[in-house]
A protein has these predicted regions:
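Vicinal oxygen chelate
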Residues: 35-45, 73-80, 85-89, 99-200, ...
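Charged, alpha-helix-forming regions
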Residues: 30-31
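Glycine/small-residue-rich interface belts in oligomeric ring/scaffold proteins
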Residues: 48-103
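N-terminal secretory signal peptides that target proteins for export/translocation
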Residues: 1-4
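Amphipathic alpha-helical segments
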Residues: 45-60, 129-131, 200-211
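Boundary at the C-terminal end of the N-terminal hydrophobic targeting segment
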Residues: 20-26
Length: 239
């Protein structure tokens, strides 16, 4: 009985310590990284995208699932407790969609870090705030996909087809009661920093500031997101 009681006490103590550590780590996380739900790494072929990330980071992304009717599928690698890297590409198992696939996948020649997605628990408030700041995020839409284990994830998000500042301005997502995808994504990588470049940095920065996002934009020859990530292969910059 004493041994069993001690075992329960130790288990509870470890659980409390784990929660405390997670809270402490979250408190140390820069504000921008706390806002990031996921980064979108678009690829013309999902297997190519998965192998590219594995070579760069040393982490092999786990299968995410299909996006029914959109002609796409994804794979995921966690970047933190509630953030992840989404590798998304065409799904050959689905019929070709009536319109173009999202994120310009049909024209994409090689994998690239295309855009990012911000967390929100009140999408309507975000859209209203954005509109007041002169930023049109588009409509709030429903989304869903089925994981390989059969669990269906549902979410709401602002229109991902709305392109602002060449995709440096994110769309926003609310997972509601669905489990966060990072919970079942491949582990081993950590997002350290996200920054951006643009030929007209002031224009992009104005929109990001209107949304209260801390992403900094510097002058560059083309629009680009640059993520600094720590992984088994060391620190890398992903573009």
């Amino acid at each position: 009985m004493i041994r069993r009681t001690l075992s329960v006490v130790v288990t509870v103590s470890l659980a409390v310590a784990s929660i405390a550590l997670t809270v402490a780590q979250s408190a140390k996380t820069p504000p921008l990284l706390q806002r990031i739900d996921h980064l979108v790494y678009a690829t013309p072929d999902l297997d190519l995208g998965i192998s590219t990330i594995e070579k760069r980071l040393g982490v092999r992304a786990t299968a995410g699932g299909q996006h029914p009717g959109l002609g796409t599928r994804n794979a995921l690698a966690a970047l933190g407790p509630t953030s992840y890297l989404e590798i998304i590409g065409p799904d050959p198992a689905q019929p070709k969609p009536a319109g173009p696939r999202r994120f310009g996948l049909d024209e994409l020649k090689s994998p690239r870090l295309l855009t990012w997605v911000a967390k929100s628990a009140d999408l309507d408030a975000v859209v209203t705030k954005a509109k007041a700041g002169g930023v049109a995020l588009g409509a709030v839409l429903p989304g869903s996909r089925k994981r390989p284990d059969g669990v269906v994830l549902s979410w709401r998000y602002t229109d991902p087809n709305t392109v602002l500042a060449d995709r440096l301005v994110p769309f926003f997502i609310d997972w509601g009661n669905s489990p966060h995808p990072s919970a079942t994504a491949a582990r081993g990588a950590t997002l350290v920093e996200l920054r951006a470049e643009h030929p007209e940095p002031e224009r992009a920065q104005k929109m990001l500031d209107a949304l209260g996002l801390g992403l900094r934009v510097s002058q560059g020859p083309a629009a680009a997101l640059i993520a600094t990530i720590d992984g088994p292969r060391g620190r890398v910059e992903l573009r």
